[in-house]
Amino acid sequence: MSLQEEIIAQLGVKPIIDPEEEIRKSVDFLKAYLKKHPFLKSYVLGISGGQDSTLAGRLAQLAVEEMRAETGDNSYRFIAVRLPYGVQVDEDDAQKALAFIQADVSLTVNIKESADAMTKAVEATGAKVSDFNKGNIKARSRMIAQYALAGSYSGAVIGTDHAAENVTAFFTKFGDGGADILPLYRLNKRQGKQLLAALGADPALYEKVPTADLEEEKPGIADEVALGVTYNEIDDYLEGKSVSAQAQETIESWWHKGQHKRHFPITVFDEFWR
């Protein structure tokens, strides 16, 4: 079995999907988790205005609506939280995403003060916090806020990790990579677009250029620029298609480099890193 085949099998990616079937699978998955854990009454998710959080947010809202209808328990709810660092340049996109999601509760927690305070506290030791490192502090500050809200609302935190992001490990460890449940896992980027289209989303919500937008020295840098490979190439690879030698090498290099992000903290019994 080639490495490409191993990765596809591990991430569970299908070459062709039925969007309606995958929507139902994710909604049922989210409902099943709530049913298994009756002390949980909500889902919490940070909404950036990008494709992934827009899709995960709408799926979560559908899940809690069905839970209310099926159980008669109106305490189930979805909490969408905006987590800007100061003023977000594409705030209009985030508001359009919220309008599409129609969350039960929409909140805003501005992370600038907390992220800046942590950066300042660390630099007070004499350490230098790079722009890239501060970007990770921002991502982790956002997850702190989401878990604080989940604690207040008897909730679980939804993550937006999907196959195209997972294969490249394009997420912050214990930041956006830290969550309780991943309803998009198994889908690549173009398949996520198909689900949003099937849900009736405005194409503007999933056709915008994806960006993590964490670095102040490189504001709005596109994911594809940071990765050195396009999402179309990543998606083709994950669907078992042939890609250029350069694209394959880049994708597989990210896969190897990011292995530590896909595991809990390493123990003496772990072998993957040796």
Swiss-Prot record:
This is NH(3)-dependent NAD(+) synthetase. Keywords: ATP-binding, Ligase, Magnesium, Metal-binding, NAD, Nucleotide-binding. GO terms for molecular function: ATP binding; glutaminase activity; metal ion binding; NAD+ synthase (glutamine-hydrolyzing) activity; NAD+ synthase activity. Its EC number is 6.3.1.5. GO terms for cellular component: cytoplasm. It catalyses: deamido-NAD(+) + NH4(+) + ATP = AMP + diphosphate + NAD(+) + H(+). Pathway: Cofactor biosynthesis; NAD(+) biosynthesis; NAD(+) from deamido-NAD(+) (ammonia route): step 1/1. Mg(2+) binds at D52, E165. Deamido-NAD(+) binds at R140, K173, D180, H260, K261. Homodimer. Belongs to the NAD synthetase family. It comes from the Bacteria. ATP binds at G46, I47, S48, G49, G50, Q51, D52, S53, T160, K189, T211. CDD domains: NAD_synthase. Catalyzes the ATP-dependent amidation of deamido-NAD to form NAD. Uses ammonia as a nitrogen source. One of its GO terms (biological process) is NAD biosynthetic process. Pfam families: NAD_synthase.
